[in-house]
Amino acid sequence: MPKHSINAWIVDDDQSLRWVLEKALKQAEMETRSFERAEHLLEALGEDVPDVLITDVRMPGMSGIALLDRLRGSYPDLPVIVITAHSDLENAVAAYKGGAFEYLPKPFDIDEAVDLVRKAAGLNGGTPQDVDEPTGAMASMIGQAPAMQEVFRSIGRLAGSSMTVLITGESGTGKELVARALHDHSPRANKPFVALNTSAIASELLESELFGHERGAFTGADSRRIGRFEQADGGTLFLDEIGDMSPELQTRLLRVLAESEFYRVGGQAAIKVDVRVIAATNQDLARAVKESRFREDLYHRLNVIRINTPPLRQRQEDIPQLLQHYLAEAAQELGSSPKSLDAEAMEALQTFKWPGNVRQLVNATRRLTVTAPGTVISAQDIPSDLGGTESSQQ
């Protein structure tokens, strides 16, 4: 913590927000200046440099992301806190890639913002790692709910990293989407992303699926097979439902994570690989460890960074946007015009508990696109198992 009073500057075109932040920072005994545009801030930096900068993303003239890029070259040790009302995954990742100290979606708790300024002022500086922009299309992720914003922030913080990640959450919450986004915003973005649902393959076949086999390794092994680890070399391997893996395969997986090498089934030569592993589960792995169903050492290897995907019932404010997005996607698949929802239908779907989470919602939009007559979906078009009032004769 610096011995002098912290000097925090604010850039935001919202006068009321500037006033609230200035007041809170001054009450915390900090010095502050505020600017309506990034260009005005850059002029002021010729005279003085603050300890911390708070900037909005979308402003007239230069954006907050463009400002970050400018500051990264000229003032690499200046901690920047990015605030935005347009809080999506792309903005979060762009902010962290640009070197932001933290990303704070609006509306935010003013005390949290003041605490972040204190933390940022204690930085020793440091230059963020360069990360290549992904060449592939980014996985579609939608969410304004606080729980989803935390997911976006976690992905943004990990941009530039190849750390092992454990994604937890109920079935259908989009764990593979999170894994793809982590890959797309990592240094491995231009390398393979290989996904495998370990619970969908019989245990006796999973070993060969993961590690491959040599010709003649077992009955029916007529040729050499390259496994998923080799396919993912240089890139990312996503292992879904890791909690269902047999003890024997857990041991083999642990060795790969520890030594970055493995043997094909029936093979004699060790094969070196460079693979980032992202695992996912809908189980409580800590409990599975206590019950001796999951190796404790493997659990700690996988649980380096954890991201939890929230169930849809905990992010009801996102349901209208999700419905609109996936209704449009379903219409595109069918080659038809997108359907909309009337107010009663929207209310029915927004209050529905969605036990199958986003996966169930996606399937529901396809179903409604096919079965609902006309271009506007009413509550009468929605089946009762989705919270609607569809008559049994429809």
Segments from the language model and where they lie:
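Acidic catalytic/metal-coordinating carboxylates
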Residues: 36-37, 63-66
